[in-house]
Each structure stands twice: as C-alpha cells, then as structure tokens.
Amino acid sequence: SGKHISTEVSFYNMDYFTKALVLFLLGFIVSCLGWLAPQSKAPKKLTWILSLSGVGMLIAGVTIRCLIQGRPPVTTLYETILFITGCCVLTAQALEYYDRRNIALTVSTFLGALGCFLSNRYELKEAVTAGDTMPSLVAVLDTNFWLSTHVTTVTLGYAAGLLAAAISHVWIFSKMLGVKKSDPSYYKSLTRMVCGTLCVGLFFSVVGTILGGIWANYSWGRFWGWDPKENGALMICLAELIILHLRM
C-alpha cells in the first residue's frame, strides 16, 4: 500500500542500523577507556547513554521492519542477526544493572557493534542476490503463529547462548592476562553471569526446539528428521546441558 511504501522509504532514509553501529562502537571505545580510569564515573555513564541509544535505534529499526512486513523479524539470516543482537544487548544491560562491574556493559557494546556490522554485510548480500532485503516468504514459512512462537523462542535461546559465550571469553582472557588476580569476586561474578545466562538460553532453546518439531509435524508429517538445522539445535541444547551439569 501507499502508506507502507512511504514508511519503507522513510525507514531506508533513517538508516537505523548504521546509526546503531556507530553508537555501539563509540560506546565500546568509551567503555575501554573507562577501564583505564576505574575511579572516574563519567565513562560508565557515557557508555550507558551510548549503549541505550544504540539498542534504541536497533529496536526502532526492527520494529518498523515488522510493521512494514506484517510478520516477526526472524525470517532471514539478516533479520535474525539483528534480532539476536538486540536480545544480547538488552540482556547484557540487565546483567550490568544488577552486577555494576562494567563487564556486561562493555560486552553489550561489543556485541552490539559486531552484530550490526555482520548484519550490514548480509544486507548487502541479500540486496545483490535477492534484489530485496524484505523478500516474500516461502509458503511453508508463511505463518505468523509459528514464526512468533518457534522461531522467536529458539532465537532468544541462541542469543542467550551467544552472550554466555562472550562473557566466558572475558573470563578466559582475564585469566590469561592476569586481570584482577587479587579480586576473586571478579571471577565469581563472571561465573554467575555465565551460568544464569546459560540457564535462560537452555530454557528457550529446549522449548523452541520442541515447538520446531511440532511445526515440522504439522507441515510435512514428521517431528524430527535429523536435518542440519535440527541437529544444530540439538547440539546447542546438549552443549548447554553439559556445561551446567559440570558446574553442578
């Protein structure tokens, strides 16, 4: 419709995701500088402003895409990267709100910048190969119910798993570089964040995988077929289960 066309033109003119990328990059740089001056509160406040502004631009862009297309933002790899990036940043910000060590906040800006950069590369690829970054859905995927339940749920699980992996790498590199050797609470805090995020990721991954099987059964008459996507979902669930059981 004419309304959707004008909205889409405005969406491309605003370039939300490039602006989000710039904000996240600035936030990451400021946060890194803040680690060099831990007594100063100004870098952390500025990082919060940049991180919140970045995720605000990201959410605005994703929301407008949803309104234009009339479906959840998880139907292509490009959209999925943006959705996962937003979920990672919001979850990291929530962790920082409770932890207040500047670890999760730094991770939020790093993952935000990385996700927006990767999405930009896939946007260019879709524009060249498909001729459109908002392509029509294939018939089997054209159902808002399963896109809103299975795909969104399992993607939330993957986002939590990605965030847990990022925080785990902070733990590893901190140990390698001897960061805060005399502060065991630093590593305990990282461990708590990883375990908590993994629990959330495992819940959504398991529920999303089961919902995917139900959708597959409705669509082509079988719950599980051992195809690459199903195997990948199962491996993520098993990996998170192993980590949590070893922690116990």
Model-derived features with residue positions:
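Hydrophobic cores of alpha-helical transmembrane segments in multi-pass integral membrane proteins
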Residues: S1, Y16-R71, T75-M134, T143-L177, ...
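Helix-loop-helix junctions that connect adjacent transmembrane helices in secondary transporters/permeases
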Residues: K181-K188
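Soluble non-transmembrane domains of integral membrane proteins
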Residues: S1-F11
